[in-house]
Amino acid sequence: MSSTTHFPDAEGFQQQSDNFMSWLQASPGVQLNPKLRLADLRAIGAGRGVVAQSNIPEGEELFSIPRAMVLTVQNSELRTLLGENLEEQMGPWLSLMLVMVYEYLQGEKSRWAPYFRVLPSRFDTLMFWSPAELQELQASTIVEKIGRSDAEKSIRDSIAPILAKRPDLFPPPPGLSSWESDAGDAALIQVGHVMGSLIMAYAFDIEKAEDDDDEGEANDESYMTDDEEEELLPKGMVPLADLLNADADRNNARLYQEEGALVMKAIKPIGQGEEIFNDYGEIPRADLLRRYGYVTDNYSVYDVLELSLETICEAAGLANADPESQPRLEFLSSLDILEDGYVIPRPVNANPSLEDILPAELVVLLATLTLSPDEFKQRVSKDKAPRPVLDANATAILIRALQMRQAQYATSLASDLQLRASLSPLPETGNVDEGARRVRMALQVRIGEKEVLQTVLGMLQPATSGSLKRSANGYGGDTRQSKTQRV
């Protein structure tokens, strides 16, 4: 979902939409359901969206985009012009970024030119926030996941040399003499961030053609590469599919990958006049803001609090959180249980229990930290972690850790709620101050995290008089399937 300000060419907005749809209709193999139209939703702050012109039953095909139309490394002529296996050399993220930079610089000569014109050119994703704006997120760990400096290093190390070597394929924009100048570096970083943000917000993992009927999943990584990312599937920009706005509650469509095409289908009946929504999945508003540049209340149920290993160890009285100098951490690490952080979700059930929300790995860590020396020796000799039981001692450590986490935020939940109540709604259209919009989104994110924190603290107080027992979840064997992964 994009705000009005993300599409600066207000006068050409509808013409760009019309040209895009004409381009799709004229493209071989594209099938568009006549019941759909690409709508101007700027009046409600949603940019473009796809709307049903008449009733659509569940299971009906909405549109089909041939694989050859998807903007991928495989489909771009750049791969042939460079004569290199870009995905193998650069990984799926940077190779697609390079291809998109190439196609973007081709302008009208690019086969995807009408597609580029309907994509946003401005973003509210955290990659584009100023340091002062990021401070509004306070102690949210989402700030640590932005990775701006790493992204820029990747652009300079992997993409800049190719542009400098082949100016015939990557002509500098008007007014720019060379990519190798300071101005050229700044221009490349800017266009790289734009393309990287488009990939992060809109690209899909593209399965091999023979893997029929797999659902397309919008990727959720930042656009830096590491060893794991290079093993991921190729990325692709799917025209029209990525123009669907997302809504956790009103999701009514899903992308399916078939042998020759990517097909969007209705997963429930869609009434005339209703917007067609994709879904990003169960992601917290902090990640919604990082990846897509907006927040909505209906994703608040997925808000989480992240508790770092460092904070837990400090609450337990350890000098540091280094497994090499902390035998108990080293022991858990050897069992593949230790994490660098633990995600605590928002309790959403009518009668939530600690067992439902506390990660088993976190409880095992707390139980290990409270073992007596003799008990710890026995565990080491058996090469078996303690059962995930949250007794009074473990609860006390967790409460201290949460209180320390609470103190990391610059303001209290009460003051944030009071501030939110005092703010008047921003207009959906017109000139909306960018900074004011971002401050409000940051406020929503930190309120969600503080609500989770306060709720869990309230649940822990009665637990200090007893203990929480839970199933061992196979901790004597392979625990990797239940590990809490940080994204």
What are these regions (language model features)?
Residues 2-69, 74-77, 117-487:
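Long, positively charged leader/targeting segments at protein N-termini
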Residues 69-71, 76-129:
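Eukaryotic helix-linker segments that join adjacent hydrophobic helices
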